[in-house]
Amino acid sequence: MGNKHIWDNHLKVNLHNFGCKKIFVISRDDATRRRKDFESAWSHFDGFDYEFVDAVKTEDINVDEVKSDKFYDAAGSLSKTIYATFLSHQKVYKKICEQPEFQKDQSIPFLVMEDDARPTPALIDSIYDGEYKGILKKLSKYSWNVFFWGR
């Protein structure tokens, strides 16, 4: 049967953007399949306003240049992938800072996801048992800097 059919008999649930103003999804501009899979996985929900942000590509990074006198990596664990991921998240952060809403009120939350994020059975369960709605309610009452939704 598979998860594909779990939605057949259900109305679209409004996710209310996970309590955020907007969702930014990091994805390579040439990752057409991954973007389509992301869109398909989340298409079963309403209230999911997202925008793809082109990821920094590993092939555009010169790690030796990064490791120059500006960076010290004692463990030698810096890779192009790790650095590209960092730069991609930094790119989204800059995009958030440019949002007019954020410039007026820096307490407005935004969500950053990667294109492999998918609804999990735990999310579905929390929606149907009311826990998700409770989390959104609590988030709206408090001032917070980071809330980690997944693993």
Tell what function each PLM region has.
Residues 1-113, 117-151:
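An acidic/histidine-cluster motif and surrounding catalytic segment
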